[in-house]
Structure formats: C-alpha cells, structure tokens
Amino acid sequence: MVSHRHLSMKSALALSLAIAAVPAASAATLELTLQDQARQRAIPIELSLPAAPCTKAPCPVALLSAGYGIGYKEYRFLVEELNRSGWLVVSVDHQLPTDAKLDRNEDVAPQLKTMRRRGVANLRFVQDSLSKSHPGYDWRHVTLIGHSLGGDISAERASEGDPTITRVVTLDNRRGALPRTAAVKVLSIRASDTQADPGVLPDAQEQKQYGACIVKLPGARHNDMYDGGPAELKAAIAKATQAFLVKNACEAAP
C-alpha cells in the first residue's frame, strides 16, 4: 500500500521496483491503495501495464473512471485493448463502501456534483502520486477515460486547464461539460437511449472549431458500456477509442 499525501522515497522506490519486476509481455496488473492524507481518503487503483516495453518513447498513460454503480475494474475490454497498444491504464476507484449512496428520492444534482468534485480530486492525486513514483511513463500527456459519472469526472478534470491533460474520452457522460479548447482533444461516444444535459456536448460549430469527435452508436444502451455489455458494442467502443488515441482519427460507427 502506498501512503502519505505525497509518496515517500521508500514508497516510490518500492512501487517502481514492483512495476519494473513484472515481465512487460504479460500485460500484468497491480492493485494498490493510495492514501490522500489531506482529505483522509483511500483511493484504490489498478495499474494495467503495457503488453510490450516502450523503447523509443515513454509509454502513454490513461486514467480510467467507472460509471456509478459499476466496479472500477469492469472495463477490461477497453483496458486490454489499450495495453496491447502500449498504454499504461490506471483504473481509479471513486466509490468506496463508506461513501454515501445516491438517493434517488432526493434531488440528485447536488449529490452528483459532490461525487464529481471528489472524483476530480482523486484523479489529481493519483496522477501526482504515480508521476513521482514511476516517472518513466508519459505523465506530461495524460488521457482521461470515463463512463457516465466517470465521464463527467473526466470531463471536469480535463476542463481545469492543466496542461498535462491532453485528451479525454467519455462514454455517454451526461452532466459534466466537455472542454472547449484546442489544447484538449475530445472523443465522446454516445449511447442511443439517453440525452446529455444542455451544454455538455460541443455543438457542431464547436466540434469543428476545436476538433472534438462525437460518435453516436445506434442501438447502444448507456448501461451496457462496460464488460457486461454485448460484444458488438464493446468492439465498437474499442475501435473508436483506438482510432482516436492511436491514429488521431474520428471514426463514426458503421
């Protein structure tokens, strides 16, 4: 377990050695719990390592945030695809057993706002901690990926103006406004059974101005965009994400 507000030299060395000791070709995973002492909060994470070593440049990094009520390790279909392309993927647990559950009998807007703010703080802490413990990865160009509430968290973090956040991928986020800036490349993959709140998605003019990519998947259900969803949907999500991250392309659904 990694502890303290900032990693100690001993903890950083231990984590670096643990990662380095894993054969790269195994695309192994490591489970850790970071401790944010300033907020008195534990942050469980899973590091999914690249399937092959990056020899020409540091491996790229993605921080992944799950949808509400879905386990943070239930996006293996996407994580493994990115691992095969040389990415380090850090899956972040924003939902601890001690956290208040969403009360749908009350106004959900302030509850979700609290969850988003907490998630944004989690992402900041995870990035700060891991960039110190294992600087061999590309922490200067981090991609954020998130589904539903995790997408809202990712969108809000990407909108803070941090120059180290350069891309964001959301799976049908509905409340956190996506960034409007050429400094952050945007891909948002949309389900067909939901609607985003006004102002969340860039309009046609903003998409053209900032190069944002909005991919609508016919027949896709919001709650199916994880490991438990149909194979065809997972393949479409992985294809669009890979095109965006690897080829810098915006590929619409067939």
What are these regions (language model features)?
Residues 93-94, 216-218:
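Residue-level recognition of beta-strand->loop/alpha-helix junctions
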Residues 127-182:
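Primarily recognizes the serine-hydrolase "nucleophile elbow" in alpha/beta-hydrolase
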